[in-house]
């Protein structure tokens, strides 16, 4: 029953388009929307960035917030419109803007601390050298702060053009999105749609409560299909490097334990599936999410992987479909 409801919802979502909007100081009047979003489909647009933040707060992710209109932002916005009983027109209208309502400012200021600078670390090219480290930390403050704001590193630069990237000195004030959100809902089930490279979470009533872009296996034969379930959840996991997975038939057969951290191959969260060796996990390169490039698992941006890990539990059902 729940899975049938989910299919209906996703069928509706697949037929929609996009728009723009923003809250922060308050509700924008409908007649202001066209002027405010003039040229929003071309290049970096600050109001699109703010729209992406608002959707991210609702767990409807475009992946990396970047201020650029694209298919992922369109899907997230259409989803929000449908979930709130609005036509998925892709046009900022009175009903849409009024429904979003008021909230805290979309952008906030963050000051770089000594602790931030001390939390950086190296990232060797060699797997064996990586295995000897205590953790695979962020390499630059730019990388760290971009993930903190759910941003692409390029968008972080655009918001802060005068900062000394990639490592602004301690005391530098940085503008970041405020991606704070309400308590995460419990997921009653998960649906992974391969054709749309997305992971959707539903509550026990079958209502969609989160939508995250994901990466899937490059090799179609390695893509799971059908009913699965969550078997394990591990925040900040380590990773077992198997050289045979990367170079089948090669001489190297020595497995290595790669320490945890944001630049670990599975990022900051691991959700193990009932299919041995498969999981949903984070990634050190969030900008690449949405591609068919994994070895078989499902990748999410670290911030979305952490969210999903907090929403599921052992036994949560998962359906993988085309």
Regions found by a protein language model. Name each.
Residues 2-17:
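Bacterial N-terminal signal peptides that target proteins for export
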Residues 71-117, 159-189:
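Extracellular LysM carbohydrate-binding repeats and other cell-envelope/extracellular binding modules
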Residues 15-25:
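Bacterial N-terminal signal peptides
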Residues 250-322:
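Exported/periplasmic cell-wall-interacting domains
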Residues 180-283:
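Gly/Pro-biased beta-strand-loop elements
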Residues 53-60, 78-86, 97, 101-105, ...:
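Sec-exported extracytoplasmic/periplasmic mature domains
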Residues 41-75, 115-150:
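Primarily a LysM-type cell-wall glycan-binding module
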Residues 26-30:
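Sec/Tat signal peptide C-region and signal peptidase I cleavage site
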């Amino acid at each position: 029953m729940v899975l049938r409801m989910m299919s209906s919802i996703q069928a509706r979502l697949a037929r929609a388009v996009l728009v723009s909007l923003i809250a922060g100081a308050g509700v924008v009047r409908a007649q202001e929307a066209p002027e405010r979003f003039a040229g929003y489909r071309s290049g970096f647009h600050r109001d699109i960035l703010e729209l992406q933040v608002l959707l991210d707060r609702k767990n409807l992710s475009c992946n990396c917030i970047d201020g650029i209109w694209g298919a992922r932002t369109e899907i997230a916005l259409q989803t929000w419109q449908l979930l709130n009983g609005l036509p998925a027109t892709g046009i900022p209208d009175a009903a849409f803007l009024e429904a979003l309502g008021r909230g805290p400012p979309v952008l906030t200021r963050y000051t770089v601390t000594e602790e931030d600078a001390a939390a950086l670390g190296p990232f060797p090219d060699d797997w064996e050298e990586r295995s000897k480290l205590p953790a695979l930390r962020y390499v630059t403050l730019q990388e760290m702060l971009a993930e903190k704001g759910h941003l692409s590193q390029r968008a972080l630069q655009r918001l802060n053009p005068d900062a000394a990237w990639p490592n602004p000195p301690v005391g530098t004030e940085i503008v970041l999105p405020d991606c704070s959100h309400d308590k995460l809902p419990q997921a009653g089930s998960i649906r992974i749609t391969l054709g749309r490279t997305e992971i959707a979470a539903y509550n026990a009533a079958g209502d969609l409560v989160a939508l995250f872009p994901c990466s899937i296996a490059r090799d179609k034969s390695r893509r799971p299909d059908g009913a699965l379930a969550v078997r394990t959840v591990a925040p900040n996991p380590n990773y077992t490097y198997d050289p045979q997975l990367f170079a089948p038939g090669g001489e190297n057969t020595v497995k290595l334990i790669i320490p945890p951290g944001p630049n670990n191959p599975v990022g900051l969260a691991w959700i193990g599936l009932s299919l041995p060796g498969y999981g949903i996990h984070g990634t050190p390169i969030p900008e690449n999410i949405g591609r068919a490039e994994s070895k078989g698992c499902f990748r999410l941006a670290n911030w979305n992987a952490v969210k999903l890990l907090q929403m599921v539990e052992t036994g949560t059902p998962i359906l993988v479909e085309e």
